Amino acid sequence: MNSEQLTEILKAAFPDAEVAVSGQAGKFDLRIVDNQFEGKRPVPRQQAVYAPLNSYIASGEVHAVTIRAMTKEEWRKASMFGA
């Protein structure tokens, strides 16, 4: 699994999202910016991101992920302050 493949999987699961993936060797940093996260706490957001990845995690193709799942407004604010 490479970052391009993972990006495509996440874009299919979150078609309206801005998706950014970096990493290699099974360890990836994920940023998914989508307003469907509005009103959701961090754990449900992470669960939504893990859902399309579970089979890849179970098979070992994806070993570890760091997830940043946020709304467009949260991303705008984070970008302004260098987060």
From Swiss-Prot:
Origin superkingdom: Bacteria
InterPro entries to which the protein is assigned, alphabetical: BolA (IPR002634), BolA-like_sf (IPR036065), BolA/IbaG_stress_morph_reg (IPR050961)
Segments crossing the lipid bilayer: none
Gene3D superfamilies: BolA-like
Family: Belongs to the BolA/IbaG family.
Protein name, as recorded: Uncharacterized protein in rpoN-murA intergenic region
Organism listed in the record: Acinetobacter guillouiae
Organism ancestry: Bacteria, Pseudomonadati, Pseudomonadota, Gammaproteobacteria, Moraxellales
